[in-house]
């Protein structure tokens, strides 16, 4: 059986193809009309071409109006040929348009395929109907055959029942014969025989299938001996009275023996129960975990490791040392609170301070107050930005080191110890040297303090000079003389950051940004030659 063909679905699928064919035919007809109109010749030919063009135009309008479903249905019903339709004198524009669409090669192939599928579908249905009719004719014959087969089966069953009956009778006859032969031997044997012989027919009745083949053969030979046991059957009734007397004692004997076997079975588990050794072994096993429990004391000793808070406390003590140093530089407190490590750090810092003071004395010649003024005008912009312009390499480097001043406790103490008289002398010397700034010279000076590896070097004095030298490049000559005086006071305050903090505390947001930048700028210090620009 082929799959069920739904014609409506096929018609719907062909709608797109019909629309395509419509477009193609309209284009073809328009081209044909243009050619007919462009042709030249006699007046009769021109009129004839005009009439043909008019007919083609009518066909185009009718093609547009036709529905795709109507085209496919008519093409499936009839065998349309365009030549026959055109030869008809009475053919309308619609008929010609429909013939054009149906005979188009794109549509014609699909319509022929559908027609073939319809034929195959019909043929399959016809063959299926014929096959069903043949089956209906064959069914009554099968029923009759079944009925005929049932009859011999019933005959066989009847024969089997008759054979079973005859076998039972034959067994009874044999019993009677045996009873008569053994009557002389004794009453005891006579009682046992019927008991055994009567059980045989019961077994044969239960297992009908087993004795069928064996018992059917025996009576076929011994059938003529039916008359003899007919007289001796009443002899079977006598032992039937004595059978229950034999059976009763046989049932009582095993009933007495069973409880005798069960009693010793109860005594044995009574001996096995007093197993007192197991709990005795388990009790000392409890003592071992008791020994393991005091081992918990070790983690208890390890937990109070107060090393972490011990590291944090000296970090808190350092800022506490800084505040009293600003008021009065008392050196008695740090040795009491701090361990010997702090003493070594202070000694190193003092050594650094001496070297820095020597460097500052050498650099007094290059101090320029005008550059310092410019530096202070742009100090806010330098502090906000992470790094200065691309040209200001040293400024960025010095600014990062300057930001570390808050962490360095020793550096603040040294700066406070430096007397303000020296700073005033430096500023006066620098002001004298301002007119000689035109003659600029470059020198390379080697500093021992820079070449040495120090744990915490302080570049406070050098920072100001570096920034001043680098800040000479940006041109800011228009600085009012009134603005110079407060800037000079600022310059003195830069050298002593402790005093500046007392005068003007920073905004918390500035402090936070400064701390963040200090963390970012924790890089290795510049260790090498210091470049100095001579005026």
Curated annotation (Swiss-Prot):
May be involved in regulating transcriptional activation of cardiac genes during the aging process. May play a role in biosynthesis and/or processing of SLC2A4 in adipose cells. It holds the Pfam family BUD22. Its main location: cytoplasm. Keywords: Coiled coil, Cytoplasm, Transcription, Transcription regulation. The keyword Cytoplasm applies. This is Serum response factor-binding protein 1. GO terms for cellular component: perinuclear region of cytoplasm. Residues 128-435, 453-535 are annotated as: Disordered. The keyword Transcription applies. Signal peptide: none annotated. InterPro entries: Bud22/SRFB1 (IPR037393), Bud22_dom (IPR015158). Residues 128-151, 159-191, 205-325, 361-376, 406-432, 460-472 have a biased composition (Basic and acidic residues). It is found in: Cytoplasm, Perinuclear region. It comes from Xenopus tropicalis (Western clawed frog). Residues 5-27, 107-177 form a coiled coil.
